[in-house]
């Protein structure tokens, strides 16, 4: 069973009213629109928008006053001199009503908790009686809540009728709870958002939406680039780990081989030692006769050793100097290597910056390439249309030339035939005349 009684007087701050959590919460970071998208207008021009803002400002002012009623009620002596007897009396009555509501709500919550613990006794008479009593208590809450609402309206009306008392009460900002201040901040933020919304024209709203969409697309592209680089980095890390594992495997194999070599050498040394002891025992008896000769050889060798030491002392000094020189050169090479590595690191960072800039230029060139490809496709389509039209014109011209040639040939043939016919007629007439003349001569 749930209690639906916690929605009354959410702005009043009684002794235990802070247990009722406010719904509105301000955001930790305020979103600041870019300067390029700020509204062109700075003041409201229409009556409707001014009325909307005035209603919201009045609401915020009333909320600020109501949120300080608990502080004024807790300091009754100070508030009576600051607000006046009428307002102080109304505030005390409002406090009593709110306290009565909170007491009843806490009592109902406690009874409900006890009934939930005693759910096994639902069929008992006393359980039903207590449940019925709780229902009666709940039925008495709405009238009390209505009285609190009326009392709140009465106190606000008295404060608005006395601007001086309202301003004095509003100055007591330290007495406001965090929840109420959070709600007021939310209302102020809502006012700023609504004010900007009323100042923004539809064209500016569309530009703002377009700007946000562009930013979103740009962030998406950047995220894709970041994902690609992260994948490449992961691949490089995996390759490096694989190489490290291979090297570790080789090192482990070498360690195992070295361990086997050490074991083999120890066994070999032990066998050699045993054989040497046996040989020593055998040779000891044979070497007694050679002791004198060996001692003489030792004396000779000692004298030779002394001579060699004296001869090689200069060589030892030269080798020591050479060793010191080599160590100095090694230190110099190490320092040079460190300096070159630092220079290479700086050069790598510069190349990385250049690479990022070139990536940005590549994105811009891709955009330009897409535009040029589209223009090229349009030009190519126009060229195809012009080529097709030119081919049709050429074919039409060929047909016209062929027709003209055919017409000229037919006309020339007709002229030739007509000339031949006329010549044949002339020849026929000439032959007739010659025959007539021959006959006349014969008669004579």
Swiss-Prot record:
Keywords: Cell projection, Cilium, Coiled coil, Cytoplasm, Cytoskeleton, Flagellum
Matches recorded under Pfam families: IQ
Coiled-coil regions listed: 212-246, 325-397
Localization per Swiss-Prot or TrEMBL: Cytoplasm, Cytoskeleton, Flagellum axoneme
Record domain IQ: where: 400-429
PROSITE patterns hit by this protein: IQ
GO cellular component, one term: motile cilium
Record region (Disordered): 421-444
Highest taxon of source: Eukaryota
InterPro entries cross-referenced by the UniProt entry: DRC10, IQ_motif_EF-hand-BS
Summary of subunit composition and partner proteins: Component of the nexin-dynein regulatory complex (N-DRC). Interacts with CFAP52.
Similarity-based family: Belongs to the DRC10 family.
The protein's role, per its UniProt record: Component of the nexin-dynein regulatory complex (N-DRC), a key regulator of ciliary/flagellar motility which maintains the alignment and integrity of the distal axoneme and regulates microtubule sliding in motile axonemes.
Protein name: Dynein regulatory complex protein 10
Biological source species: Bos taurus
Gene: IQCD
């Amino acid at each position: 069973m749930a209690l639906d009684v916690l929605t009354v007087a959410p702005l009043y701050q009684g002794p235990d009213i802070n247990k009722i959590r406010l719904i509105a919460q301000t955001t930790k970071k305020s979103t600041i629109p870019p300067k390029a998208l700020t509204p062109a207008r700075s003041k409201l021009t229409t009556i409707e928008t001014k009325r909307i803002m005035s209603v919201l400002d009045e609401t915020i002012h009333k909320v600020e006053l109501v949120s300080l009623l608990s502080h004024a009620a807790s300091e009754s002596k100070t508030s009576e001199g600051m607000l006046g007897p009428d307002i102080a009396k109304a505030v005390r009555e409002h406090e009593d009503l709110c306290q009565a509501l909170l007491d009843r709500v806490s009592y109902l919550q406690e009874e409900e908790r006890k009934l939930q613990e005693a759910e096994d006794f639902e069929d008992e008479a006393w359980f039903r009686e207590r449940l019925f009593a709780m229902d009666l208590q709940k039925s008495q809450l709405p009238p009390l809540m209505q009285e609190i609402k009326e009392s709140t309206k009465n106190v606000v009306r008295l404060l608005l009728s006395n601007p001086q008392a309202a301003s004095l009460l509003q100055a007591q900002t330290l007495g406001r709870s965090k929840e109420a201040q959070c709600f007021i901040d939310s209302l102020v933020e809502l006012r700023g958002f609504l004010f900007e919304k009323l100042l923004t024209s539809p064209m500016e709203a569309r530009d703002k939406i377009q700007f946000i969409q562009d930013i979103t697309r740009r962030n998406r592209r950047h995220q894709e680039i970041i994902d690609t680089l992260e994948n490449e980095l992961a691949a490089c890390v995996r390759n490096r780990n694989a190489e490290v594992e291979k090297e570790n495997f080789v090192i482990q194999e070498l360690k195992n081989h070295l361990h086997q070599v050490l074991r083999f050498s120890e066994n070999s040394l032990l066998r050699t030692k045993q054989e040497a002891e046996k040989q020593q025992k055998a040779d000891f008896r044979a070497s007694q006769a050679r002791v004198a000769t060996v001692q003489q050889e030792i004396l000779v060798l000692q004298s030779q050793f002394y001579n060699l030491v004296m001869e090689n002392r200069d060589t030892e000094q030269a080798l020591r100097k050479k060793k010191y020189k080599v160590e100095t050169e090694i230190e110099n090479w190490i320092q040079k290597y460190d300096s070159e590595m630092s220079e290479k690191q700086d050069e790598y960072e510069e190349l990385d910056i250049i690479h990022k800039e070139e990536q940005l230029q590549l994105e811009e060139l891709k955009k330009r390439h897409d535009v040029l490809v589209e223009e090229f496709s349009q030009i190519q389509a126009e060229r195809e249309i012009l080529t097709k039209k030119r081919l049709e014109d050429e074919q039409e011209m060929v047909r016209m030339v062929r027709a003209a040639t055919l017409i000229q040939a037919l006309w020339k043939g007709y002229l030739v035939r007509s000339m031949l016919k006329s010549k044949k007629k002339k020849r026929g007439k000439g032959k007739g005349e010659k025959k007539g003349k021959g006959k006349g001569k014969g008669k004579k």
